[in-house]
Amino acid sequence: MITKETIVAEVVTDYPKAADVFKHAGIDFCCGGAISIEQASQKSKLSLEALLSQLQQLERQSEPGGGLNPKYLSVASLIQYIQAAYHEPLKEELKQLTPYITKVAKVHGPQHDYLIELKALYTQYKNNMTAHTAQEDDHDFPKMIAFSNGQDVAEIEQIILDLKTDHDEVGQILKKMNQLTNDYTIPNEACNTWRLVYQRLQAIEKATYRHVHLENHVLFNKLHA
């Protein structure tokens, strides 16, 4: 049962929809998820009682992990899942979304200068995540699989530390984008392309937080076990 002592990241691992509860409450379940619900509530828009009530209701209504709980996967299977669910879709989405963001910044940026800043932040996010996922796929994930199979990988702790640093940096970019767009609130004057950009950036934000959560709090924990 979820209690005030339960760790935020563990709740999201067992009940992925809890991520929406935490986001609405202003709680970082991703890079800042290694704290108890009681500690999180002190930084929240909700009281401890209200937060626990929502989470316990979700617990009663949900099957843990929606039928797949990643914490029970092997390191190799979890990595394969992360690549299929997050790395490949993100690569394709960044390719498709970039022209739309470029168009919105060009057409509407002169009247709404924050859109030019948004494009710059998006470009930073895109460059960081493209390099980050390539580094994982080509170098870090094979090292992790080797380590989980009993091979000596002396640099495993440094690999994890470096990846967590990358995650923190990406998290800061996402927060800036969210603040800049007022949580992706679509202005009345927004054209269809502008609306599309906000909707898809919001989806990227949500997917990235889940992606980072799986690595920080499930994959890396398996390598420490």
From Swiss-Prot:
A GO term for molecular function: metal ion binding
UniProt cross-references to Pfam families, sorted A to Z: Hemerythrin, ScdA_N
Matching InterPro entries: Hemerythrin-like (IPR012312), RIC_family (IPR019903), ScdA (IPR023551), ScdA-like_N_sf (IPR038062)
GO BP annotations, alphabetical order: protein repair; response to nitrosative stress; response to oxidative stress
Top-level taxon of the source organism: Bacteria
Coiled-coil features, chain-numbered ranges: none
Keywords: Cytoplasm, Iron, Metal-binding, Stress response
Location within or outside the cell: Cytoplasm
One Gene Ontology cellular component: cytoplasm
Main location group: cytoplasm
Entry function: Di-iron-containing protein involved in the repair of iron-sulfur clusters damaged by oxidative and nitrosative stress conditions.
Assembly and interaction partners: Homodimer.
UniProt similarity note: Belongs to the RIC family. ScdA subfamily.
Protein name, UniProt field: Iron-sulfur cluster repair protein ScdA
